[in-house]
Amino acid sequence: MNFETVIGLEIHAELKSKTKIFCSCSTKFGAEPNANTCPICTGVPGTLPVLNEEVVNLAIKAGTALGCTINKYNKMDRKNYFYPDLPKNYQTSQFDMPICSGGLVEFEHEGKEVKVRLNRIHIEEDAGKLVHVEGEPISLVDYNRVGVPLAEIVTEPDLRSVSEAVAFMKKLKSILEYGEISDCRMEQGSLRCDANISLRPVGQKEFGLRVELKNINSFRELQKALEKEERRQRELYTYGEGHKIVQETRRWDAAKGKTIPMRSKEEADDYRYVVEPDLPPIIIYDEQIETITKSLPEMPDEKKERFLTAYELSEKEVDILIGDKGLATFFEKVVELGATPKIASNWILGDILRILNDRKIESEDMHIEAENFAKLLKVVEEGKISNNVGREVLDEIFDENKDPMKVIEEKGLMQISSSDELEKIVAEVIANNPQSVEDFKAGKTQSAGFLMGQVMKLSKGKANPKVAKELVDKKLSEI
């Protein structure tokens, strides 16, 4: 029997606010444990929350960017459950009246247009973080993250493959980044997702029992977790053990490469939602929505059209560039400084990405500035240094943002393009390799390539290849 995979996602995006959702504590990542806390976010009795207006505006911005309906009357609710990372024993969230409803995300995947409906977007506070002490039977709790504002974006179960789910997440990340709604730093946990996956026989309308997967914080882990769970369910159905699939929550264990049962899947009733009595309803006005809509910056699809028109790049190149906001911004700055778009694109998509992957860092964290990179591309394009030397210089200047011209000058890397200088080198190579000259005269044209290699070796790679080849060919033709 053939089965169809059905996937829905619940994405938690940290909103780009400098302060928490109900207090003035900082949301900055990387502080000392429990440094960014106060009596309000840790739930000390007698304290009262005050809703951060910026959080509401960012949620409206997200809803506008994703084609949602903005609900002008919505409210906060208490979601009750007990866990060490939740100091109040409830999470302030939204239940039946979210800030945004509906929405649609469209993207191309494997040659076809995919449309994924959104169910809702609601705002809520994040929980703390458990830190497990190695070798000790205890866990510590860092409450810095408690109260950090989240937008939970819930899709309909419209995804039909693991690769579609990953492609959707990349598209959503791009929209949130370009809209300046979230920084989406997955390695810092500011963009996470839970995945609901089920299988059903092809042609069946009813959904199968869904399993929720938690602890997913990268595109690679999302793919691995979904593939493993999809395989697990498929094997159970194949061997007649489909009854063993139950509606449950499973945790993705990246180290073991498998999903592990956590608990049976909760329903809304299990959380005993109640209206938050300490916060008034949220009222949103038409003027507020209009102002926020007008403030939306250029979005990914708009930027793609502009790049294709303005820079004459291939669609594949543009897709990779705009898929990383940091790279796209860097590319535009370099071009504005005079770099040829095609050359800038080739170097960014080749060498800059290579270095980022080697260093395991994000484009936002690279130190090299567009001005210095543009200088480097200029001397390469003018033939003053070779591509290979350019790559060596890039590796050296990347981390400390050095001036490439100083590095080239200090190391004497400038390419030799003077015919007078190169003629001396070519003459020496010809004189030192009489057998290769005889071979060339005998019709072995590959000998010219060998002699050219000797010219590059003698010049320590600094000979201008084009000029050097012309001189080698000329010298051989005269013999």
UniProtKB/Swiss-Prot annotation:
Annotated EC: 6.3.5.-
One Pfam match: GatB_Yqey
InterPro entries named in the record: Asn/Gln-tRNA_amidoTrfase_suB/E (IPR017959), Asn/Gln-tRNA_Trfase_suB/E_cat (IPR006075), Asn/Gln_amidotransferase (IPR018027), Asn/Gln_tRNA_amidoTrase-B-like (IPR003789), GatB (IPR004413), GatB_C_1 (IPR042114), GatB_Yqey_C_2 (IPR023168), Gln-tRNA_amidoTrfase_suB_CS (IPR017958)
Gene3D superfamilies linked to this entry: 1.10.10.410, GatB domain, N-terminal subdomain
Example GO biological process: translation
UniProtKB keywords: ATP-binding, Ligase, Nucleotide-binding, Protein biosynthesis
Single GO MF annotation: glutaminyl-tRNA synthase (glutamine-hydrolyzing) activity
Family annotation (SUPFAM superfamilies): GatB/YqeY motif, Glutamine synthetase/guanido kinase
Keyword Calcium in record: no
Catalysed reactions, as listed in the record: L-glutamyl-tRNA(Gln) + L-glutamine + ATP + H2O = L-glutaminyl-tRNA(Gln) + L-glutamate + ADP + phosphate + H(+); L-aspartyl-tRNA(Asn) + L-glutamine + ATP + H2O = L-asparaginyl-tRNA(Asn) + L-glutamate + ADP + phosphate + 2 H(+)
Entry similarity comment: Belongs to the GatB/GatE family. GatB subfamily.
The protein's assembly and partners: Heterotrimer of A, B and C subunits.
Protein function: Allows the formation of correctly charged Asn-tRNA(Asn) or Gln-tRNA(Gln) through the transamidation of misacylated Asp-tRNA(Asn) or Glu-tRNA(Gln) in organisms which lack either or both of asparaginyl-tRNA or glutaminyl-tRNA synthetases. The reaction takes place in the presence of glutamine and ATP through an activated phospho-Asp-tRNA(Asn) or phospho-Glu-tRNA(Gln).
Identification of the protein by name: Aspartyl/glutamyl-tRNA(Asn/Gln) amidotransferase subunit B
Organism: Clostridium beijerinckii (strain ATCC 51743 / NCIMB 8052) (Clostridium acetobutylicum)
Phylogenetic placement of the source organism: Bacteria, Bacillati, Bacillota, Clostridia, Eubacteriales
Gene: gatB
